[in-house]
Amino acid sequence: MSDPPDYSLALKYGITDRASGIARATEARVRMTDLAARVFGDKQELDVPRMTLMSLLTRAQAFHDGTLNAARSDNPFASFTLLRSYAENAAILIWVSEKQGEIRRLYPGAPVEQKFSIGKLLAYAENGSGGFAGIYSQLSGFAHPSAATALSGWRATDEHSLVSWKSTPQFKTEGDFMLACVWLIELADANAQLWALTWTKYFGPNSEWDAPSWPETGLSR
């Protein structure tokens, strides 16, 4: 997505090539699940509030694993589109970690009018963490037909003034591949920290908030 590629951010995470990018991103996945396991503890009661928040962790792991598999397959479209969904999951966690009771809007049977607006979530995330909207916009460039993908499949060759085309997807540059790994690491760490914070606020030993009950008035099983 950058031309010429900028490797400085990748180097910050110890990424120097594709193999190290995949390795660092895999380590980030382990950190995410390890943190969740520590926060979760050995035994938990199961109810809809807990199950709802646990499902957000499942979504995070799904997007992480899917992005890793897509990157290994040299598929930038699937990689960046899944990263976009991963970012949306982080945006929801930012919202529910800071707004008491809003987790109820994700409960089964929640009214349609309570559905989250992605635009509103992104604006809120941008206010708290500058740069979120810019990254999301870049990811959206691959999720939708746009100028960012206008020359998909085309690549410069080692021979002077020659290009090649393949119908199968491929990352345009090594920098793009490593950038996908960087974002994967950052989103894994963000989702992990936000999920742990939200869980602790609702269900930790020194919980600050009471989880909204289910079903509430207006919700149906």
Outline where the language-model segments fall.
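A cross-kingdom marker of C-terminal helix-rich interaction/assembly modules
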Residues: M1-L82, E88, I92-L93, G101-R221
